[in-house]
């Protein structure tokens, strides 16, 4: 068998993600663009989004964003509308939570828009289930 003479796999080629710390300029919508919130990921580079103009559209993630920008449900995205198809659109940009909050503050997003917060919601909002102890199970076990 031949010796491995390479310098690593595909993760080495990817390099370090240095864009995370970089603040980018806030991009507002232009003509032919709309803000939307992801409802459902469909796979194959497609998703279903509810636009803030009230229309539900099937969106295609363009090649520049594929495998680089991960989009999840309830993310705020900027989509480019198609002239020839009203019910389909292309994803141009994904806003992170801070950018979405500032868009809401500028009045670009409606007030009812839910932004996917990653903050902790404080005490009492745990996903724990509380059970009440109402049975006399101890007596039944002793009788056996």
Swiss-Prot record:
Sequence ranges of Acidic residues compositional bias: 124-144
Residue ranges of domain S1-like in the record: 22-96
Taxonomic lineage of the native organism: Eukaryota, Metazoa, Chordata, Craniata, Vertebrata
Coiled coil region boundaries: none
GO biological process, any: translational initiation
Function recorded in the entry: Component of the 43S pre-initiation complex (43S PIC), which binds to the mRNA cap-proximal region, scans mRNA 5'-untranslated region, and locates the initiation codon. This protein enhances formation of the cap-proximal complex. Together with EIF1, facilitates scanning, start codon recognition, promotion of the assembly of 48S complex at the initiation codon (43S PIC becomes 48S PIC after the start codon is reached), and dissociation of aberrant complexes.
GO cellular component: cytoplasm
Swiss-Prot/TrEMBL keywords: Cytoplasm, Initiation factor, Protein biosynthesis, RNA-binding, tRNA-binding
Organism: Rattus norvegicus (Rat)
UniProt biased composition (Basic residues): 1-15
Region annotation Disordered: where it falls in the sequence: 1-26, 114-144
Pfam families: eIF-1a
Any one GO molecular-function label of the UniProt entry: translation initiation factor activity
Family: Belongs to the eIF-1A family.
Feature: compositional bias, Basic and acidic residues: 16-26
Protein's name in the database: Eukaryotic translation initiation factor 1A
Keyword tRNA-binding part of the UniProt annotation: yes
Superkingdom assignment: Eukaryota
